[in-house]
């Protein structure tokens, strides 16, 4: 009997199939009865079938002999186990990936499109080869006349790889789908199937070989019953692409056509329409557009719009928890589906665990993230044919796997501590590549980290370094020399066992078993078993000449394609799965999460090795008994049907939800499926991240522990008697945690003042500080406390960053100036060759010293140094050329001032503080230029500060204490008149930024062309970017003394930005950066006021989390290393920026006078 049973997606097709199969088994127990279902639901279907049999016997359990519930692969093994000639060892996905990598590497000279190998490409190739094998396709018989070049190239390479693959496995291995081919061979010759019955259900599509299996059984078996779910529960031979059930109707059509062509009798049974359809059936009719409208559908469908994925996941957990707690449901009554479960792995499973909800996640877990795989990849990253490349990232990765722990460590915690310390030391000293071969004691003289002064600690770390480096280099050197595959694999295996890696995996397994985590306990064993199998497979694939690159590539690609097998830890558990995967029926409630426009429908856009266009071109070249399906197209055509199946799974209620924001706070739109459902129900529930009032609390209440955070939040905004009762019940169950959480809810994210006494212990009675430190205080006083009070800092890394580049600039110019002064050479007297020779002399000395020498070990850093040298050369040559236009010469470089220095700093009494306290300002000026005006008994001075990017003096930042540097430097000059001018008068020109750059103007810049459309020659070489900019004295006499050429009318300064003379002989100066001598004195006075004010706050122990913000993009938090400590949130009442608004010169002077109590 051949029968096709069809029903709607809500009809119990599987129940009917199981019922008939069990009935057949009871009537003919001596005959074989087979129930064939997708592998994904084999276990649950088997349980149902046996339960149904037991129920029919009025028993709670029963034994069976000839009733089999199998997947297609298990059906194959069932028949092949007794076959005369068994199959060779099956080549699994991982081993196949390894073999294909070997073939591609071997044949790469003959291939046209394979330049590099990656795991994704190998997987695509593997799937295509399986399709070719499964589809009975002969690549040699493909007519290439009408193929485009891309398709021809792919077929060319595919033919080479496919032939080599089949040749390699012949007689040694079988592919995972070859078992299906062999099954059909056995079935074709089997003469004992006449009494067997086969029942198929829950399939919507079959492969060519599976289709052939069913056709063979139709001709040989006593009974073949096929169950399908279609749109209307009937067969529609005229279904077209785009129709709701096109894919499954095409599947049915293949069988009906086969039966009709061979005049085989068959019956078609349909499920009858229900006279009183349930809400579930009504929803399905709406979804398939069989009806237009129905009442009361809201009882069956709930739409949820969540604030975030966290809120969405919490809604699911809360709904399940509450309904189970009320006794209406068991955990196994719930199914959670998502288009992509990976999006929810950091939300859903932790929330379910927090609420103690048992669950089974059937999403496959990849092996490639396991520590053993990381270790193997890291070993390969250090291998090179010429030399062993000891890269730091790989070495640290191996240490952090915790798989190679030397025997002298008795406690793992001690090893972990040393690994952290070793990483700190290595990063601080820039240890990379061959530097790993040197003892750590060779680096400590640099004294860049605390560890450098701890000899015993360095000895411990060096012992760990020696152990690891010796083991790694010994293994890789041996593998590089070895030619025998057998011996090489033995070396590799010995490395894993002799260094305790195997025993470490065994320990992890035992620990997981002891903790009751059966899933985790299986992973080390599965991984080790696969590794052993891969080593055996490699030996069979490549028994002769061993190749290290090939070995590691094959091993890594194999692991990347491997997954851990999953087992449920309990039968009563919520099931987590993905849309599109076959599910058994019987769920009472289904949650479909992640219903965003980007996820549903889940349209596949990334093709396989052969694109849909390639496949369409090839279709006409295949023989009649061969075909190649476009799985991507098949998936895309089946999306609506699959979503309908998901909706039909829920007996009582289905929830469909989506988040309005993703993890990056980007707005998400709901899926077109969600919008269709909204048209039916016209309502949605909004799940917020937090309850807004007490009445919202029901949407958040689960267990006492999980709900406590929400309760404490409500307590802070909307307390009530009812709430107090809830809190009392929670306190009874978890008193200690409740008290801690309630205290935390009252947390004020503002640091507390430490008081004068503690501040004095941190900073001393007198404050010895620099300008930049006080600027940090005004940027954010809490950052000042963390940096200079507690002395916290981010981990030191000896990398060539912006700070290092700036240091290199400064040191180059410092050494140049000192060399010139030492040899009494006027820079203006040097020609270009002499200047460059002096610069090179300075650089060579620098690069052989300290931190720069370590950085030079990296070839890329060497290139960066050359770029910096070009930049400093350009600035130095520009400076040299400009010296004939000014009498100012560099007298001092990196001039330090403060306590203990030749140059006095600012020493100011700190007012309004008990006791006697003083602030001593120290620092260093990049350069001070001096010009002796002998005829006037006067000395002209300017301060130069090097900057790696363009900078202007910002009045508003100065007023708020964040840009005091330049004014403070001028104050130092004034306070040290004797040092700079002796008995002469010191005249201040100003304080200027010198941008160290070789940047040119862009070709489309309007600065290159004047109003007459002529090119400005002085702009072409980027010279304006090298002009001084900053605070300047607006006294005309001082200006002409600094640049004598400006004594003529209509002259543009060649030294100072935005300075020129007008036709009438007066000066045009930058409005907000030029000051009279009286105004400069006012700035100096206010600068000292700021210094004293900051010192008072610091020494009194006052601390505020008060970062500045200027505009929308610039703030004290932009580049702060302490954001994780601040936990600053401008949305909180306690956390506010202190805003800085732009000031004009007039506003600045007015505000300063007001603050200093001076009359305007």
UniProtKB/Swiss-Prot annotation:
Its EC number is 3.1.-.-. GO terms for biological process: double-strand break repair via homologous recombination. Despite having helicase-like domains, this subunit does not have helicase activity. This is ATP-dependent helicase/deoxyribonuclease subunit B. GO terms for molecular function: 5'-3' exonuclease activity; ATP binding; double-stranded DNA binding; helicase activity; hydrolase activity, acting on acid anhydrides. The keyword Protein biosynthesis does not apply. It comes from Lactobacillus acidophilus (strain ATCC 700396 / NCK56 / N2 / NCFM). The heterodimer acts as both an ATP-dependent DNA helicase and an ATP-dependent, dual-direction single-stranded exonuclease. Recognizes the chi site generating a DNA molecule suitable for the initiation of homologous recombination. This subunit has 5' -> 3' nuclease activity but not helicase activity. Gene3D superfamilies: P-loop containing nucleotide triphosphate hydrolases (3.40.50.300). Its cofactor is Mg(2+). It comes from the Bacteria. It is an enzyme of class 3 (hydrolase). Heterodimer of AddA and RexB. SUPFAM superfamilies: P-loop containing nucleoside triphosphate hydrolases (SSF52540). Keywords: ATP-binding, DNA damage, DNA repair, DNA-binding, Exonuclease, Helicase, Hydrolase, Nuclease, Nucleotide-binding. The keyword DNA-binding applies. Belongs to the helicase family. AddB/RexB type 2 subfamily.
